[in-house]
Amino acid sequence: MKRKWIIAAACACALIFAGCSSDTATENAPEAVEEITITNEENVPTSYDCIVVDGSPEGVTAAISAARNGLSTLLICQDEALGGLYTLGELNYIDVPESRDGTVLVEGIYKEFYDAVGGSGFDVTVAKNTFYEMVQAEDNITLRVQSKFVEPVLEDHAVTGVTVEEDGERVTYTAPVVIDATPDGDVCAAAGCDYTFAGEDIGERDREMGVTLVFRLSGVDWEKVSEFVQTPEDGESAAEGGVNGNLAWGYSTEGYAYEPEDDAMRLRGFNIARQANGDVLINALVIFDVDALDAESRAEGIARGQKELPRIVEYMNENCVGFEKAELVDTAEQLYVRETRHIRCEDTLTIDDVLENRSQEAAIAVSNYPVDVQATKTQTYGTVVGFPDQYEIGFGSLIPQNIDGLMIVGRAAGYTSMAAGSARIVPTGMACAQAAGVAARVALEDENIRVLRDLLASDADIAEIQQLLTEQGARLDHTETHEAVMDHWAYDGLKVIRSMGFADGGYDNDYRLDETVSGPRFANMMNTVVKKSGLALEPRIAVNEETNNEEMLTALAEKVAALDGSAAPADFAASVQFLQARNILDATLAENFADPSATADAASCYMLAARLYEYLLTLPGASAYEAIDRLS
C-alpha cells in the first residue's frame, strides 16, 4: 500500500503548526493523520541474504541500507507498526547530534527520515507512516509485522537465521547475515554473546536509571506555554526553558516539586512536543523499580504510571501555566528504556573515546551527545558527565565477540556503560545501522571473508565500507577536537574518577578543578573508590561539611589502615607519612595538602582518589572493573 500523499500533507501541517498560536492551531487543526495499517504477505520466502530483527528506527535503517546494497532483506518487526521508541514509545523529541560549530553529524538514511517527518517534534502517526513508506520503497525488503523473535538458529557458533512466532505458529528464516536491532540486544543474548548489564562494567550492575512513560494531553494553551518557558523567573537572568516551533522545554521547578503517590516515581522538567491535532506529548514522568528485560515488569510500570497520571494532570492544572485546562488523552504503548544490556564486541567505545573526541581506525559513524546519566531511585537528579564535540564509532563496536554471522546496532552495541550515556541515542544507532547494511554487502561480496569479524582485518574492505557509506549519503568527516581539560596536570586522575561515573563536567566540560571540595564530596569520592575496588566499604569515611586537609587525610589514612591491616596513624603528620609510604600521596599532592588548616582543590582530590584506587587494587580481595581507567 503506497500512501505518500499522507506523509507530504502531514509534514506540511507540522511545519505550519510550528508557527501557530494555540488558538489558531485548534481552530485550523487538520483531521488526525490516518495511520496506514500494515498486513503481512502470504507465502514469503524463508531464505534471504540478510535478516534484520526489530522494527526500531535502527532496524528500519539497517534493512533499507542492506536492500539498497542489493541484498534480499527480511525485516522482522515485533510490533504492529514500525518505529519502536520513536512511535510506540512516542519519544518524538529527536536528539540531533550537532558539533560545536553547528555541523549536523549524522546524515544518510537518518536525514531522509528527519526531513520527511519535518524535523524534531514530529507527529507520531506521520512517523509510523514514514517508516513504512521508506521500507515499501525498497523492492528488496520483505516486511513481517507482529513477528515475535523466539530464538536464533545457531550452527558452529554462528547465527544462520532466526525462529519467530507469527499468528501463533513458529517460522524459521535463514540468512548468512543477521543484524540485531533490538534495543536490548535480545538476539545476541539468546545466541550466547557475552554482555554486561547496566553499570556492571564499573561495579554498578544494580544501577537503575529510571524509565519514562510519555503521555499525551489535550487542551494545552501553546501560546501561554511558549511565553512562560521563555520568561525568566524573578532574580534570574535567563529563562529555564525555551521554545522552538512545536517543541518546548521547561517547568523544572514545577516538575520536581510534584510529590508522587507512588514513591518509586518522579516528575522532572517537561520536554513538550505538539502534535498535528494540537495535542502535546510530555516526556517528564520517570518510573523506577522496573525490570526492563521482563515483559510483566514493563507492563506493570506502564500501569503504575497510568494510575499516577490523573493526579499529575490535576497538579499541572493547578500549578503549571498553560496547562490549566489540560486533559489526559492517553500514554505511549511502550516505555522509554535508557539502558539494559551492553554486548561485548570486538571493539568497545569508551568514555575517554567519547569525551576526548577520538578517531577510530575503522570508523563507520560520527556522532555526539552529552554523556547523560539519568536519575536513579536514590539520586534525585540526573547528571551530565561531559559533552563531546564529536567522536567516531568503529566497525568493531558492531561485531559481537565469540558469535559469528551477527551484528548489533542500537544502544546495546559495543559501548561501555558510561560511553553509552552518549552513544545510546537513536540517530547514532541509525548511523551505525546504515553501516551494518553496507558491511553485510561487502562481507557477502568478498570471497575471502568467512565471518563478519574478518572484515576488521581487511583494510581494503573497511575502506570499501567507508567509501560506500559516503557515496550513499552518510557523513564520516571528523575533527578530533582537543579539550582544554586534557592539558590540566590532574587530568589523569580526573579520568579515573570520571570513568567511575563520579565526576560531572556538565554541558561545558567544567569539572571545577580549581575549586575547593566540600567535606561530603570528598568523603563520597573516597568512599566511591573504596567501593569500586571491591573492598569493605563500612565503616565509611566521614568528614565535616567545612573540612580541611588535616581532617581529610587523617580520615583517609584511618580507612586505608583498616583495609590493609595497619595501625591507624596518630596525627596529621603521621597520616601524611603513612599515605606517602603507600604512594597514595606523591610529592605534588604532599605539597598541595601540606597546610593542615587549608582545604585542597578538586584537582588534588581527584588525583588523590585515583592514586588511592591504584593502591587498593594491590590489596588481597580487591578487583578492578574493566571500564574503569587506571593511572598510566
Residue ranges and their predicted role:
Residues I16-G19:
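C-terminal motif of bacterial Sec signal peptides marking the signal peptidase cleavage site
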